[in-house]
Amino acid sequence: ISLGLVGSEMCIRDRHCAVHQSTRGKDQGSISKITLTCSGGPFYNLPKNKFKEITIQRALKHPIWQMGKKITIDSSTLMNKALEIIEAKYLFNIDSEKIDTIIHPEGLVHSFVEFSDGTILASMANPDMKIPISYGLGFPKSISSVSKKIDLQTLKKLTFHKINRRKFPSIDFAYFALNHGRGMPI
């Protein structure tokens, strides 16, 4: 789907669509940082020394999303987030040092875009793939979505946590691949 990014197509992923919506019409040079969020998966609160007890059935129970088996396992290990970091670098033509990721257990904020003036735009929506799909299909217009809207009046909290990279080394794999040349991410 052509969205006027670096290439002629855009990956229809919730995080990348969220970034695109926040950066659309903005000067690319004014972007200081892109932050992609993740729920932390089913093992966010599990100590690393308990990882050996993880079963496939447990790994397939994502706390937010209902997905296929492979992407659910990739999400459980944060490998999916590592792939999204690599994709963001090429989709938005941004240095890897300007891409960050953070755990957001509620799954309502999909990305943050920080600009050089200190402004940060957050893209929020309920976790539902109908939203980025309708965005891609309707671009540049917005299509009314059948997805449940967030009621800000009843929203109690939004929490964010730094990713423990010793527990989830896939994030470091992404940066290693990006910093070692264009072919390395393949």
State what each model feature region is.
Residues 1-7, 11-12:
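Single conserved hydrophobic/aromatic residue that forms the stacking wall/gate
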Residues 13-15, 22-23, 34-40, 75-76, ...:
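Fold-independent oxyanion-binding glycine-rich loops
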Residues 18-80:
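Conserved anion/nucleotide-ligand pocket segment
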Residues 18-22, 33, 84-91, 136, ...:
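Alpha-helical scaffold segments in soluble metabolic enzymes
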Residues 29, 80-83, 132, 169:
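Charged, alpha-helix-enriched surfaces in structured cytosolic catalytic cores
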Residues 66-108:
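Rossmann-like dinucleotide-binding domain that binds NAD(P)(H)
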Residues 92-186:
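C-terminal substrate-binding/catalytic lobe of Rossmann-fold NAD(P)-dependent dehydrogenases
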